[in-house]
Amino acid sequence: MGAGPVIPTRLATVRRRRPWRGVLLTLAAVAVVASIGTYLTAPRPGGAMAPASTSSTGGHALATLLGNHGVEVVVADSIADVEAAARPDSLLLVAQTQYLVDNALLDRLAKAPGDLLLVAPTSRTRTALTPQLRIAAASPFNSQPNCTLREANRAGSVQWGPSDTYQATGDLVLTSCYGGALVRFRAEGRTITVVGSSNFMTNGGLLPAGNAALAMNLAGNRPRLVWYAPDHIEGEMSSPSSLSDLIPENVHWTIWQLWLVVLLVALWKGRRIGPLVAEELPVVIRASETVEGRGRLYRSRRARDRAADALRTATLQRLRPRLGVGAGAPAPAVVTTIAQRSKADPPFVAYHLFGPAPATDNDLLQLARALDDIERQVTHS
C-alpha cells in the first residue's frame, strides 16, 4: 500500500518537465535558424565592383541578376585567369583599372579574345586598350541616351553620377550615348564598349530607374561574361599583402585577450598596493609658451595693471645688473642712472618704469615698446 502513490507522483513530475523541455527545444531551434540566417545575410567584404562584394560599391547584385538571366559569370582574379577564361564568344568586363600599372600585363589583357567592356578606365588603361579614344571636353551632362545603341535605348534615362566622357581620335566610327559617357566602336574584329562611371553598376546604384537595365544590357549581351575587377596591383610592382596579413586571425584575438589579462592583473595589484601617490616632478616649459599663456590670461581678465607690473619688473631685473644698481635702490636713483646711460629724458624713463597702469590695451602695447627701447639703449650704450 505504501508504494502505490509513488507512481502517479513520478508521472506528474515528468508531465511538469515536458513543457520546459519543449520550450528549450524551441529556443534552440530559433537560435540555430537565426544563426544560419545571420551567416547567409552577412555582408561579404570585397573591393569596389567585386562580384562577390555586397557593399554599396560592390557588384554582387549585378552578378546575381546576370546569373539569374542565364549569363555565365566567370570571376577572374588575375590576368592569367582572364586569358584562361576569355573566348571569342565571351565579353570581358574590366573595372578597378587603377591597379593595372604594368604595361606588359596590359598588353596581355589587350590580346584577350572576345568583346571588351571597360568601366571607368584610367588614362594608362585607356591608352593601352583603347588608343582610339580620348577624354572629351567638359560639356552639359545628358541622362538620356540620344543615340542609336539598342542597349541604351532600352534602358532609357540613367543616373550616372560623376563620369568621364569620351570622343574619338581620327576617323574612328564611334557610337556615343549619354553625352559621351557611354561609347562603343569596332576595332580589331571585336566590339569595345567604354563607360565613364561604375556607379550605375554597383549594388548601391542599381535602384534608380534605367540603371539596372543599362548595366544588364551592357554586361549581359554575351552568353559568357569574364569579370575582372582587381583589388591589388598585379605584376612586378605587386605588393598585395603585408606582414600582418600573414598572421593568423586567431593570433589577433589571443593578443587582445592577453592585453585584457594584463589590465585585470594591473587593476588587481593596484588595489592591493593602494592608491597612487602624487609626486611633484620638474616640468620643462618653453618660455614663449609661458609668456603667451600669461598674456592671454591677463587679456581675458583685463588685468592691464598686472601685465604692466610684470613688464616693468622684468625690465628692471635685467637692467639693474648692467647698471650696477642694487635691488633696494630707490626709484629716483634708478631713473637717473638709466637716463644717463640711455641718453633719455628722465621723466620719460620714470613714467614708463614707475608710472601708473595703462588704461587701454593700446597703452599697454605702447608701454611694452617703450620698455623695450629703454632696455635696448642701455644695452648698446
Curated annotation (Swiss-Prot):
Which InterPro entries does the record match to this protein?
DUF4350 (IPR025646)
- Keywords in alphabetical order, please: Cell membrane, Membrane, Transmembrane, Transmembrane helix
The record gives the membrane topology as:
Multi-pass membrane protein
Membrane-spanning regions, if any?
Answer: 22-42, 246-266
- Pfam short name (any one): DUF4350
Annotated signal sequence is none
Give the highest taxon in the source lineage. Answer: Bacteria
Q: Name one GO cellular component term.
A: plasma membrane
* Annotated localization: Cell membrane
Major place of localization? membrane
Descriptive protein name: Uncharacterized membrane protein Rv3691
User: Native species of this protein?
Assistant: Mycobacterium tuberculosis (strain ATCC 25618 / H37Rv)
